Amino acid sequence: MVTPRIGGNKGKTYWYMIYTLENKTGADRNFFLSITAKSDRKKTYSDLFLPSVERAIQRQEGRPLWGKADKFKKLKDKSAGDRKFSYTRIKDGEKRLCVAVFNEFENTSKNITIRTTGLSNDIEVIIDTDGRTLLRERIRLMHLSRPGDEYEVTLDSFKNLRMEWQKETTEIKFKDE
């Protein structure tokens, strides 16, 4: 957790997750990574775009981390047409130390599930018997437990319970429907 002392987010506590992103595919790849979290209290959290918080985390960790601030900085430099899909490029063999930033979790939450999409190209479009368009993709789930005291959450650390790949199907609705 981090609590910035300066900037617009001063005094607010954020939880963050450091992870490594590595391209071992044999070719440069474009990706669109989405990281969300859900508590056992059914509250959901998204990876936030907070440059000042990312800088505070980098100071706390003592190393550079790639996050949403870096992604949007690169996006800003692209032409309007290239910005449309907001993909990020990672070169073959490249390894990035990254950070995802979340608002503080509820004090009473004991279990958190991190959901990551965009790590796999295992995606298929399905038209079901009712004519609906469905997208089935492979997602990564990380199940965490937060043992500890609800009054001293800043001292808590998370325990990895298990990680798994899962297929998820979502209905896609188009604007003209």
Language model segments and positions:
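Short Pro-Gly-centered flexible turn/kink motifs
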Residues: 89-100
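The feature marks short-to-medium sequence segments in extracytoplasmic or secretory-pathway proteins
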Residues: 24-91, 125-150, 161, 171-177
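Short, solvent-exposed loop/turn segments enriched in Ser/Thr/Gly
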Residues: 12-18
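Low-complexity, acidic Ser/Thr/Pro/Gly-rich terminal tails and inter-domain linkers that flank the onset
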Residues: 1-12
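Long, low-complexity ectodomains and other extracytoplasmic segments of secretory-pathway proteins
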Residues: 155-157, 164
